[in-house]
């Protein structure tokens, strides 16, 4: 059974320091164990204070690979792209950020591209951080016409493209 812990902070800055410290420790531990670290991180505005503090840490960033936990069907250059946000946050530090296929407007093709890119990475990730949107969605998991197909996908799949029920941008 997983034990949940509740942590409260007096400010966003205090929370960002704590979370960045924890993620930095995960990265260092992975690099010590395997000489590499793989992170799956969310997009959106909420994690930006953490990303800023994390990217400023003196870590072996050249050994860190980051993928988005989810992506919109937009070009990487689009300001709504989670891969773009992650690249802006971490590439200057030296991390490698891999887009997962949002640049393809076809939902099924985008899912297949994402799965292929993720299959090429050492699995499992050292950290999977799921973001939560203002409307309560988590990691772009929305009810919609493809929800059951996603839930029934083969266990070997690392990504599935889904059409959401309504736009969440």
Tell what function each PLM region has:
Residues 1-3, 61-129:
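Ligand-binding beta-strand-loop-alpha-helix segment within the catalytic cores
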Residues 127, 134-166:
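Class I SAM-dependent methyltransferase SAM-binding "motif I" and its flanking Rossmann-like core
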Residues 20-28, 51, 55-56, 87, ...:
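Generic structural signal for well-ordered alpha-helical scaffold segments
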Residues 28-56:
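Glycine-rich N-terminal segment of FAD-binding domains in flavoprotein oxidoreductases
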Residues 53-61, 84-88, 143-153:
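A glycine- and small-aliphatic-rich helix-loop capping segment at beta-alpha/alpha-beta transitions
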Residues 1-39:
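N-terminal glycine-/serine-/threonine-rich phosphate-binding loop
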């Amino acid at each position: 059974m997983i034990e949940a812990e509740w942590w409260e902070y007096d400010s966003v800055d205090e929370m960002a320091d704590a979370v960045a410290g924890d993620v930095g420790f995960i990265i260092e531990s992975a690099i010590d164990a395997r000489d590499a670290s793989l992170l799956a991180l969310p997009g959106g505005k909420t994690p930006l204070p953490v990303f800023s503090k994390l990217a400023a840490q003196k870590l072996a960033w050249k050994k860190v690979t980051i993928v988005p936990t989810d992506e919109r069907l937009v070009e990487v250059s689009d300001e709504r792209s989670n891969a773009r946000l992650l690249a802006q946050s971490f590439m200057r530090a030296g991390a490698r950020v891999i887009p997962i296929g949002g640049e393809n407007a076809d939902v099924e093709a985008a899912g297949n591209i994402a799965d292929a890119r993720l299959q090429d990475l050492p699995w499992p990730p050292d950290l999977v951080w799921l973001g939560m949107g203002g409307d309560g969605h988590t990691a772009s998991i929305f009810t919609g016409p493809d929800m059951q197909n996603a839930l029934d996908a083969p266990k070997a799949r690392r990504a599935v493209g889904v059409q959401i029920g309504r736009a969440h941008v």
